[in-house]
């Protein structure tokens, strides 16, 4: 329970915790506490090859590639000479359906790499997929939501920049608790 004086939480064992502020930083699960949908789940695909000798890899041996086309492609080598390739994100949000696409998506990614680097043998040895969330504008949602008041603060940093946004968000959350202005409040807050 959250009101204008603070938050009261009760554990499954019956213990009560009272606080002046509650910070909800529960990853994707935070969405369930908001009526407004602030992020959408998506799926990303990746595979890794068996080791490829350094001569065949050529300049790829020490290169990270990010093709910014949509859908994007990224790849890098591992210490033992494998190619780690990923991308081809889609809007599939059901794990079983996503997992059924893994082999086809890996093949599609491998074909794309082969076209870009025809001299490099690209055969997926192991492929996988994962779910991530992204916001419409690519920015995190950090701060108080109008539906819960200023005592419940959310820190929802999604996507590939989540760790960076979480660090920035920590400073913003602290400023909000201390009732100070913060330069990122308008950019990351629920008022946008």
Feature names for model-found ranges:
Residues 78-81, 148:
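Short acidic-glycine loop/turn motifs at beta-strand connectors
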Residues 7, 82-83, 151-153:
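Hydrophobic residues embedded in beta-strands of well-ordered beta-sheets
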Residues 91-99, 111-192:
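C-terminal catalytic lobe of FAD-dependent flavoproteins
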Residues 24, 83-86:
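Short hydrophobic-aromatic micro-motifs
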Residues 11-15, 87-90, 158:
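Secondary-structure transition/turn motif
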Residues 1-78:
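Flavin-dependent oxidoreductases
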């Amino acid at each position: 329970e959250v009101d204008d004086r603070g938050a009261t939480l009760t554990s499954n064992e019956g213990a009560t915790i009272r606080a002046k502020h509650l910070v909800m930083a529960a990853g994707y699960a935070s969405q369930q506490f908001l009526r407004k949908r602030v992020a959408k789940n998506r799926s990303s695909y990746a595979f890794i090859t068996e080791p490829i000798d350094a001569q065949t890899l050529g300049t790829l041996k020490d290169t990270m590639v990010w093709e910014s086309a949509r859908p994007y492609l990224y790849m890098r080598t591992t210490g033992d000479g494998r190619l780690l390739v990923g991308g081809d994100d889609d809007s599939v949000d059901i794990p079983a359906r996503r997992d059924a696409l893994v082999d086809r998506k890996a093949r599609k990614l491998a074909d794309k790499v082969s076209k870009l680097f025809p001299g490099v043998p690209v055969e997926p040895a192991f492929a996988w997929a994962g779910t991530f969330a992204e916001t419409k504008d690519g920015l995190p949602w950090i701060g108080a939501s109008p539906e819960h008041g200023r005592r419940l603060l959310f820190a929802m940093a999604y996507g590939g920049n989540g760790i960076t946004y979480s660090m920035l968000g920590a400073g913003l959350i602290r400023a909000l608790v201390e009732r100070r202005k913060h330069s990122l409040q308008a950019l990351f807050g629920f008022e946008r």
